[in-house]
Amino acid sequence: MKKVLLTFIIEILIFSCSGTKIGKNKTRYFDENNVEISKSQFNRIRSTNKLLGIPGDSINHKKLTLREKRGKINNRKSLELLLEKATNLELDSLKPIVIIFHPGKDKNNSGAFKNYKSNSYNIERIRQWYGQLEDGINQVAQTKPIYIYKDSSGLEKYDGILTWYKDPEKTIEKLFFKHHYPGSSFVVISKNGDYISYFGEFGKEYVWEATQIMNK
């Protein structure tokens, strides 16, 4: 009888521990205001492309975040000097700083352009897209974007097309891109330190519009 009772207790403990583990590992979903929502709600909102899904505060949490953020940095001059040292470029203190940020290889930035180095047509598509991006920025603010990366993985397709620079002291990441947003992101900083950042994959027109706003 004691043996049967002991076996029964052990089985209960095993089941309890297993249930607790499953509960802890279950993914929980939150909106941009940290309000918990269902998985279906999360996916439906994310599918609109107005918000991005990012890791939450815990390993099994996923959170939605707005794609655009506006703010102000305290010392633009210090950022200028840091970027000039890292890139060997001379920045105009009266013009906006436009930064394209590559976080590292992911399924978003290794998809559409994944094999574009394989033939001249694909290379030309990349060259044309970024050429148009730079032409638009130049028309709006007479400046050029700076290409900054956190992790160089996934940049091979830009060889001979764009020059990328390592994020100096992780400054750009800390100031503007604290999470790994899928694809690439950008930020435009005005002469006064005001900025507009946009998280995740973007169209050229978003960069042009932000540059125009920050050039006032």
Predicted regions and their residues:
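Bacterial Sec-dependent N-terminal signal peptides
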Residues: 1-27
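Mid-length scaffold segments of soluble, non-membrane domains
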Residues: 109-110, 118-150
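Short active-site neighborhood of thiol/selenol oxidoreductases, capturing the structured segment around
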Residues: 86-126
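A short, hydrophobic beta-strand/beta-hairpin element that forms part of a small beta-sheet core
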Residues: 183-198
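Thioredoxin-like thiol-disulfide oxidoreductase module
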Residues: 152-182
